[in-house]
From Swiss-Prot:
Gene3D superfamilies: 3.30.300.20, P-loop containing nucleotide triphosphate hydrolases. GTP 1 binds at residues 9-16, 56-60, 118-121. GO terms for biological process: ribosome biogenesis. This is GTPase Der. GTPase that plays an essential role in the late steps of ribosome biogenesis. InterPro entries: G_ENGA (IPR031166), GTP-bd (IPR006073), GTPase_Der (IPR016484), KH_dom-like (IPR032859), KH_dom-like_a/b (IPR015946), P-loop_NTPase (IPR027417), Small_GTP-bd (IPR005225).
Length: 490
């Protein structure tokens, strides 16, 4: 399960700045969900290959009345469901009563908490953080988030050791087989056999969507009609339910995010939908079913979820629920809206179903298997290079500064999602339009459906870069004569 890190603190202590630093390689998801404050930010970050979800909880206004009465509900939820909390304080402003109230609340929750003193630029860090030791949260980590100073140290000395201690796990290098095959083909050898067989593993299927779109009904319909072996297996964290099942002699694991347990004083509105649970389900899944309510249409929340799914590279099947009972005119309007707002998602199958009555539910699994097979299929270097060559023959790369961009060869760089790595000269200057052309050409040639495909470009190295030619004795004498001539002419 992907760990969750919550940024907590008073307003204007630099939480959003640190959030942007941590998620610099990812597009933050801005969510506006019922029961949660507007513009709450969720993003994916990475430290030494270990991914985690980062939450900007917004400002918590702790007062003498007690932090629980003044803390926003979404911030309470984020703290409760986070694995670790980075409690941020303002080193310039010094210790405030609100800081003490928040620290008291965090101590009562017994969450792993690290105290981060921001805005230490221009100050003596040791002197600036002295007052904050009275909060009783242990060591203080000074940073300057706006300039990035101390952020890397925070990641390496705080988050990374914590992630290793709490969730030690061996990360399978899914790209190893591709690189072994590529190197073997380059050396004229046979690639070693890979023991990993995606068909032997169950397909992890996450059902996500806004509240009341029919996720629970769809889950119950799937389990109630076609289950062979079903039992509830609580997830390792945050009560996500993993439900193994079998259909058409194929094993699946449904990741159920519909049931969110009540926690403390969190209201029912917030309880209905946990953004954190949904993001973790997407990260952990092979295929995601995005459920949309046909009667309400596509909302900004749906598009936000869709954006996170695309950034995660997960296979996708779009499910339009509550299709029954709609007039033909309304159905046509819904389809037009889908085409208009989701026209850029040309790789995903769209199913119109009624989870309540079961119509169209059975056809979902055909698209799920298709998407999973597309995302995990192995493709040889020879085939990818051949497809790239055909694409170049059909449409030449543009000229850059009078020279034609040259694409040399392509090989696989990973799967789920499929990654194609293209090597060449001046590839960094390729326009986005040509990159999209190559992506669509590979998708069509490989018949990839249900999963995004990513193209990565690598510049060929100049073998003469940073190297100086050794002059022969004759060249040395000629150079001396030329230098004498130049000096005389001056």
């Amino acid at each position: 399960m992907v760990p969750v890190v919550a940024l907590v603190g008073r307003p204007n202590v630099g939480k959003s700045t640190l959030f942007n630093r941590l998620t610099r390689t990812r597009d933050a998801l801005v969510a506006d969900f019922p029961g949660l404050t507007r513009d709450r930010k969720y993003g994916r970050a990475e430290v030494e290959g270990r991914e985690f979800i980062c939450i900007d909880t917004g400002g918590i206004d702790g007062t003498e009345d007690g932090v629980e009465t003044r803390m926003a509900e979404q911030s309470l939820l984020a703290i409760e469901e986070a694995d670790v909390v980075l409690f941020m304080v303002d080193a310039r402003a010094g210790l405030m009563p609100a800081d003490e109230a928040i620290a008291k609340h965090l101590r009562s929750r017994e969450k792993p908490t690290f105290l981060v003193a921001n805005k230490t630029d221009g100050l003596d860090p040791d002197q600036a953080v002295v007052d904050f030791y009275s909060l009783g949260l242990g060591e203080i980590y000074p940073i300057a988030a706006s300039h990035g100073r101390g952020v890397l140290s925070l990641l390496e000395h705080v988050l990374l050791p914590w992630m290793d201690d709490v969730a030690p796990q061996e990360k399978v290098d899914e790209d190893a087989e591709y690189w072994a095959q590529f190197e073997a083909e380059q050396n004229g050898e046979e690639a070693p056999e890979d023991d990993f067989d995606p068909q032997s593993l169950p397909i992890k299927l996450a059902i996500v969507g806004r509240p009341n779109v029919g996720k629970s009904t769809l889950t119950n319909r799937i389990l109630g009609e076609e289950r062979v072996v079903v039992y509830d297996m609580p997830g390792t964290t945050r009560d996500s339910i993993y439900i193994p099942m079998e259909r058409d002699e194929r094993e699946y694991v449904l990741i159920d995010t519909a049931g969110v347990r009540k926690r403390g004083k969190i209201t029912d509105a917030v309880e209905k939908f946990s953004v954190i649970k949904t993001l973790q389900a997407i990260e952990d899944a092979n295929v995601v079913l995005l459920v949309i309510d046909a009667r309400e249409g596509i909302s900004d929340q749906d598009l936000s979820l869709l954006g996170f799914i695309l950034n995660s590279g997960r296979s996708l099947v779009i499910v339009v629920n509550k299709w029954d009972g709609l007039s033909q005119e309304v159905k046509e309007q819904v389809k037009e809206t889908l085409d208009f707002r989701l026209g850029f998602i040309d790789f995903a199958r769209v199913h119109f179903i009624s989870a309540l009555h079961g119509s169209g539910v059975g056809n979902l699994f055909e698209s799920v298997r298709e998407a999973y097979d597309s995302s995990t299929r192995r493709v040889s270097t020879a085939m990818l290079t051949r497809i790239m060559t055909m694409a170049v023959e059909d449409h030449q790369p543009p000229l850059v500064r009078g020279r034609r961009v040259k694409l040399k060869y392509a090989h696989a760089g990973g799967y789920n999602p499929p990654i194609v790595v293209i090597h060449g000269n001046q590839v960094k200057d390729l326009p986005d339009s040509y990159k999209r052309y190559l992506m669509n050409y590979f998708r069509k040639s490989l018949e990839v459906m249900g999963t995004p495909i990513r193209i990565q470009f690598k510049e060929g190295e100049n073998p003469y870069a940073n190297k100086r030619n050794t002059l022969t004795p004759t060249q040395m004498r000629k150079r001396k004569r030329l230098m004498k001539h130049i000096k005389k002419s001056k």
